[in-house]
């Protein structure tokens, strides 16, 4: 083998290795799910149609709990528009409440959300037209609690999802979201996507160039998704970030607090 051919071969092999290291076929977010039951939290299955409502949650994420908080804890106003019938129970959308003697009991689980690399767009995508990760789990283990159907179609329609993570800012990252349910997203603890209320499919895009971030720094990325109504559950997320996780809890959840171990890990 001549030197030129050997050089070409080595260059090809090195580029292949570097490419594969830089762009793994999949990346996995270990997320926290909270199974909800409308009989315990009446903010679920309010039996209404509505529209997108912005301004339901505070524009700055609570740095201690790392979950959204309502702007108002009173009935009426935006809470009525967003079909938050009991504001005091909103805190348990994305936090565990496993005491059956108290209101808003839920079932926390951990779940792996696997993103697939799209080489044509150089992004990672999670796309699920029927995002029902806890069918016949949680409260729905009991057939008597499968009370909210879409006609004759069964799913466990009532659950919320929380992703607490971080990324190293490279200077041009973006996020695309498509969903027919509530989504709130925060970068650097600031609200960047505000899709509250009971609404139909909506697409949103975050361009991080507009957020005043510094290249090379690590920033928190927190995403909250909640399905409160029957019919469907669509979720598409497209990202092009360098994902990092400062620490994982003993459930394997990034920045978790161990609470999702109560219900176990969903395969």
Curated annotation (Swiss-Prot):
Report TM segments.
none
Compartments (UniProt record) = Secreted
**Which region is the signal sequence?**
1-22
Glycosylation is annotated at 47, 62, 99
Q: What is its main location?
A: secreted
**What does the entry list under GO cellular component?**
extracellular region
- Domain PA14, first and last residues per copy: 116-257
**Superkingdom of the source species:** Eukaryota
**What keyword terms does UniProt attach to this protein?**
Glycoprotein, Secreted, Signal
Against InterPro entries, the record matches this protein to: Fibro_Slime, PA14/GLEYA, PA14_dom, Prespore-cell_inducing_factor
- Family of this protein: Belongs to the prespore-cell-inducing factor family.
Cross-referenced NCBIfam families: Fibro_Slime
Q: What is this protein called?
A: Protein psiS
Question: From what organism does this protein derive?
Answer: Dictyostelium discoideum (Social amoeba)
